[in-house]
From Swiss-Prot:
It comes from Stenotrophomonas maltophilia (strain K279a). This is Methylthioribulose-1-phosphate dehydratase. Its cofactor is Zn(2+). Belongs to the aldolase class II family. MtnB subfamily. The gene is mtnB. It catalyses: 5-(methylsulfanyl)-D-ribulose 1-phosphate = 5-methylsulfanyl-2,3-dioxopentyl phosphate + H2O. GO terms for molecular function: aldehyde-lyase activity; methylthioribulose 1-phosphate dehydratase activity; zinc ion binding.
Amino acid sequence: MDTTTFPYDTARLGELAQLLIDNVRELAQAGWTPATSSNFSHRLDDRHAAITVSGKDKGRLIEDDIMVVDFDGKAVGRPLRPSAETLLHTQLYRRFPEIGCVLHTHSPVQTIASRLYAPQGHVHLEGYELLKAFAGNSTHEMAIDVPVFANTQDMNVLSKQVDDLLDRQNLWGYLIDGHGLYAWGRDMAEARRHLEAFEFLFHCELELRRLHG
């Protein structure tokens, strides 16, 4: 009999694994996680997060494909390999106790928007009714600038850039140039709402840009 003990609630991990599997499958079916890309996580407790392992088809995840990391991004419990971008998840859990879920996707809309708006460093969104989808917003009469960070394989550098901007600006997500979108929320439902709102608003901006030449 396996008597291994873990420094987290394994029953809670099982619940979160199924939550992640079900939601990530839907995002994969939408075409937002091509070629094993993207990564997804959920806060497990005040020291750990459940996160998808690296290199797996996100439309075919099983419970063993969800691992645990601490907030320094290190594997806990099982010796599995987390995503190279794990630090971009755990920095949010460490900084904001209210954040419960982080989603990272690679839809064509998100990736194209990241390329087109990289020179400006942000995507400006203003006057849209769907801006009310972002937690804390109650009107369309507002504007937000969604940052576009330069892509890098050095997650320490990128996480520092994100932290520096979070010191100055309230964010619900950000883009990485030529890469994709990070969005988060208090739980899976809120994180998905933010993710889907960004997708819709970026699509609108790209269409306006195309129509106006």
